[in-house]
Each structure stands twice: as C-alpha cells, then as structure tokens.
Amino acid sequence: MMPTLNLHNIQYSQLDSKTWCATAEVTASCPLESLHLFDNLPSLFNANLLNIDTDKFSHITWHYHISNVSLSARKIAYQQRQQQRAGVRLLLQSLLNKLDINDSLDDVSFPYRLVNSQYYVCFSHTGASSPNTSTQPSGEKSFNELDNKVAVVISCHRPAGIDIETNNVEWRVAKRFYHINEIAILQTLTITQRDTVAKLLWQIKESFIKIYQYTLAQGLGMDYSHLMTCLINSIKEKPPLFVFEDDKTKYYLAYLPEQQTVIVY
C-alpha cells in the first residue's frame, strides 16, 4: 500500500503565455502495515501463556507504543522512486486545476503530453541518486524523514525541460563530464560562484537532455559555455525569476533561485 502523499509549499509560475510551471515539497506518511504491529499477536494474546483471566481483560490498562520505523538504503530508494512518481503527478494535477484545464497525462513515450490538448509536460524531482550530487551521510532513516521536492512544467508551444536540484555538483564530477570550455570558465570563479554555476549548468544540461532525449554522457558533454555570462550575472543579481534566451537553440531559460529550479522552454 502506498503511503498518503501531501504537497507543501506549492509555488506556481507563469513563464509566458504558453508555459507554466509549479514546484512543491512532497511528504509521505508511513503506511500502518509496514510497522508489523501484528506479527506476534498469537503469542501476545494467548491467555494461558500470560496466565490472565480473560474475564478481567476489560479491566486491564493497555499501553500502546509504535516505534520509529527504520528503512534500509534499498528500501529508501524504492520508497523515494514510488513517492516521486506519484508526487510529480499529484503536482501536475494541482497545476491543471490551477489553470482550469481538464485533461490527463499520456506518459507512454517521451516527451510526455496531455491527452486532449496535446500540451507538453516534463517532470523533475530531487532525492534520486545521480552522479552529480555531493555524497550524503549514509545510514538508516525513518520513512517520515524522506522529503522530496518535485517540479512540473507545461508548455503548449514545444517540448520543455525542467530540473530541480538541492545539492551541488561535485567538482570532480564537473571536470569529468563538462565540456572543456565550461571548465576553463569555471576555474576562473570563486569556489562559491563555481559551485553555483556548475549546478546551474547541470540543470540546463538535464533540461536539454529531457527535450532532445540525449544520453546522459552526450547531454552532459554539450558545450553551454556561451550561457555562462548570463548565469554568472543571475547569481550576482539574485532576482526571484531570471529569464534569458539561448541564441543558439532559440530556447528560453528560466531560473527560479528560491525553488532551485531551472526551466528550458
């Protein structure tokens, strides 16, 4: 049984007359059946073993205790995937309701589209393991500690890409995958600027991967050094929404710093 999902801090943005996006945090309550509360019921309620007069059961004061549930790394990954898949679709429905659009998702093939309107849809979420994220401390976690951010973009014009990231890109990963022209510029920045721009580059690359269906290695190796001046300006100015056009692809790029989200549309 899937846990109950809840969306928090939903933020809607209209990027232009043909493009809308939404971001949110999705949390899940732990399903009762995973607690294994009733595994030992036969022995616990054997009146002979407990030496209890069953007639006196109604006079017994009962104390209930549910311990925290710890999940293995594999279980966490599985729960995250399930939670993210349901979470982005829940956010899509919320955005459709906001736009007063009565439609459903066709996710048979990429790019995803809405069935009736044929609008393009793209999802993103945090929490999935990927080579870009900094290593986090390992160990078991309670299911209720799992907290993921989700994002969705709808475009009635053409395929769009979106990427939401909370972790920086490790410098060794950037040097391995990024284009040599990008690395040359990144090396001239302060460490703080470098980490921020490297992360934005990753998000742009991920977004274009979703649009053009590049392989991961192919998409990460693309040269977007011509965009880096705009990216550097965006982190200096810190606007709530930063939009500029990529002259080479003729796509627009939007950066929402508060939501840690990049959209290519």
Question: PLM features: residue spans?
Answer:
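Core catalytic alpha/beta fold that binds nucleotide/phospho-ligands
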Residues: 1-265
